[in-house]
Design a protein with these regions (language model features):
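Terminal disorder- and signal-encoded targeting elements
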Residues: 1-2, 200-203
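Histidine-centered catalytic micro-motifs
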Residues: 50-60, 105-111, 170-177
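Structural detector of well-ordered beta-strand residues that form the stable sheet scaffold
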Residues: 27, 75, 170-171
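Conserved N-terminal boundary motif of the eukaryotic protein kinase catalytic domain
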Residues: 99-103
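Active-site HxH/HxHxD metal-binding segment of metal-dependent hydrolases
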Residues: 14, 30-98, 188-191
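Conserved beta-strand hairpin/beta-sheet module of binuclear metal-dependent hydrolase folds
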Residues: 1-40, 113-130
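Metallo-beta-lactamase
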Residues: 33, 110-193, 197
C-alpha cells in the first residue's frame, strides 16, 4: 500500500494526514496545515475520498480546502456539513486498495473511529506509537471536556479484539509511523491507559 504522510513537513500544529494511493485514492484526515492541498497535488490529481477518524480541529480544519480542490466523497461517523457518507461501527470502507473495517473508538472524542484491515491500522488519536508522553505505545489524552479514560480503555480493547494478528503497519493521528508488531504497541498502550494515571503531569 502506497502511503504518503501529507503533513510531515508542517511547521504548525496539525494531526498526521495520510494520502493512500490506489484504486480508491483516499486521504485519512485532512489536518490543519494550509499546505495539505499542495502536497496532495504533488502526488495525484484524483482524490476519490476523505475518511475522518474524528472531527477535532487539527483533523478537519483543511477539509473544506481539500473538498474544493479535489471534490472527493467525505466519510465520517458524525454529522459534518461536507459529509457524503455516514460510517458506523462494523461498516467497511475501501482505503487505497484495501478494505478496512470501521471500529467505533470513543474516549478521546465521542465521534472517533479507527480503521483496520488485514495489514494496517489507522488508529487516529486512540493509540499512537510515540508522542510527547511515551516513546512506545501511547494513547490519546482524556483530560478535556467530553473525553473519558474508561471509554478509551474499552476502545483499545475493541481494537485488539478485532485486529487481525498479522497487522504490521500503524498510522496514528500523532507521533511516528510504526512498522512491525502493531499488536504489541496497542497492548502496551492499553497497559498504560489501564493504570489510570495522568498522561501528562498537568492532567
Amino acid at each position: 500500500m502506497e502511503v504518503h504522510h501529507v503533513t510531515e513537513g508542517a511547521e504548525t500544529f496539525t494531526c498526521n494526514a495520510f494520502l493512500v494511493i490506489g484504486e480508491e485514492t483516499t486521504l485519512v484526515d485532512a489536518g490543519s496545515w494550509d499546505g495539505v492541498v499542495d502536497v496532495i497535488a504533488d502526488h495525484t490529481d484524483d482524490l476519490d475520498r476523505v475518511v475522518l477518524t474524528h472531527q477535532h480541529g487539527d483533523h478537519v480544519e483543511q477539509l473544506e480546502a481539500v473538498v474544493e480542490a479535489f471534490d472527493p466523497e467525505v466519510y465520517a461517523h458524525s454529522h459534518h456539513e461536507l459529509r457524503d457518507h455516514d460510517i458506523s461501527d462494523g461498516d467497511t470502507v475501501q482505503i487505497g486498495d484495501e478494505e478496512f473495517e470501521v471500529v467505533y473508538t470513543p474516549g478521546h472524542a465521542d465521534d472517533h473511529v479507527s480503521f483496520v484491515s488485514e495489514s494496517t491500522l489507522f488508529s487516529g488519536d486512540v493509540v499512537v506509537h510515540d508522542d510527547g508522553a511515551f516513546e512506545y505505545g501511547s494513547f490519546g489524552r482524556t483530560d478535556m471536556p467530553g473525553q473519558s479514560r474508561e471509554q478509551l480503555i474499552e476502545s483499545i480493547e475493541d481494537i485488539l479484539e478485532r485486529m487481525p494478528a498479522d497487522v504490521e503497519h500503524m498510522y496514528a493521528g500523532h507521533g511516528g509511523i510504526f512498522h512491525g508488531d502493531v499488536r504489541d504497541v496497542v497492548e502496551t498502550a492499553l497497559e498504560r491507559a489501564e493504570k489510570r494515571e495522568p498522561k501528562y503531569p498537568e492532567e
